[in-house]
Amino acid sequence: MPYAIDELQEIIGNLRTELVEPIDSGGVNNTRLGRDRVERMSAEVVDSNPYSRLMALQRMNIVKDYERIRDKAVAIVGVGGVGSVTADMLTRCGIGKLILFDYDKVELANMNRLFFTPNQAGLSKVAAAGATLNFINPDVEIEMFNFNITTVDNFDRFLNAISQGGRIAGQPVDLVLSCVDNFEARMAINAACNERNLNWFESGVSENAVSGHIQFIRPGDTACFACAPPLVVAENIDEKTLKKEGVCAASLPTTMGITAGFLVQNVLKYLLNFGEVSDYLGYNALSDFFPKMTLKPNPQCDDSNCLVRQMEFQAKPKPVVVEEKADNEEPLHATNEWGIELVAENAPEINPTSTETPVVGEGLKLAYEAPEKSSETSEETVTTAPPDDASLEDLMAQMKSM
């Protein structure tokens, strides 16, 4: 049956709407297969509970109160290979709030890395990431900023966002994560966190894509990024002059994913207070080598705020380590049926063949003393060996006489 013109126009309009909606929502059609918000995390083991595997960490005594993660806010600067995967992991872990910073767009050249999909090409990275993350976990509050933090005007906006964008309005974020790919942005993050005294993680992957690292920076306590800057920063070299036309850095989703995994693992340990947070953790893919170290702050750092934080940290009272004194416990058993005595570790060894009484430590005594040998010598029975040519009868006669 042929359609009327009005009906055809309506069909075309509906098709056009279906095509435009995913683009407006960051390339994700949120009307399909979504889930409702969850008010409280539950440990109930059912297929419909998105947090059952996470809450199991409490039952296994790894985390005391996992639901505290909903009270935490984390800022991620750079939503590329490492940053997008980091945001994805934290969203699946149920973080309370994510603040995303990036000014780049999704390109097909990004498809070798994780998270983004081809239909998101052309969208801003923060818009594409925010839409996907909201679809994965609608319980997470996501705030997006599409600007370059290294410019003068935008730096103030960035500073205000991390110092006022906490889970509680007007409070700073709990942690800042640097997932950028240039030193200029790292220095901007470093300056902001030193100024506002915020802890942050720096992360990165090498240009040849076979190594990566994370570094936990606590202003005044550990070295900031300006305390031991890379050669490019120390020599004030413009990074833009190092880029060549037609040449790009290598990128592997494996190295990106491993680095992001290390980063999120330490973020969770820091936020939920379990395990040991690494100050610096590296990764060499060629030899599967994982170096760890701690970098002390540079007293001659070029960042004036870093020097202020160092003075504040040194002025803090150091925690007093109290040595526990062992209580004088009563003996468990009043009787000593077997005559067991304790011997000091530094007591000389007793030679069982020696006739001398060994000297023992003060307060100790020997449990057994060897009897003295009698001065009277016992008669020794001398047995002469039979001659080689003795007969069997002679040997038997000798044995009978013994």
Swiss-Prot record:
InterPro entries tied to this protein: D-isomer_DH_CS1, ThiF/MoeB/HesA, ThiF_NAD_FAD-bd, Ubiquitin-activating_enz
Region entry Disordered, spans: 369-402
Annotated positions binding Zn(2+): 224, 227, 301, 306
Gene Ontology cellular component terms for the protein in this record: cytosol
Gene Ontology annotations of biological process type: neuromuscular process; protein ufmylation
Matches recorded under SUPFAM superfamilies: Activating enzymes of the ubiquitin-like proteins
One GO MF term: UFM1 activating enzyme activity
Listed Pfam families: ThiF (PF00899)
Keyword ATP-binding: yes
Family: Belongs to the ubiquitin-activating E1 family. UBA5 subfamily.
Function: E1-like enzyme which activates UFM1.
Protein name as annotated: Ubiquitin-like modifier-activating enzyme 5
The organism of origin for this protein: Drosophila erecta (Fruit fly)
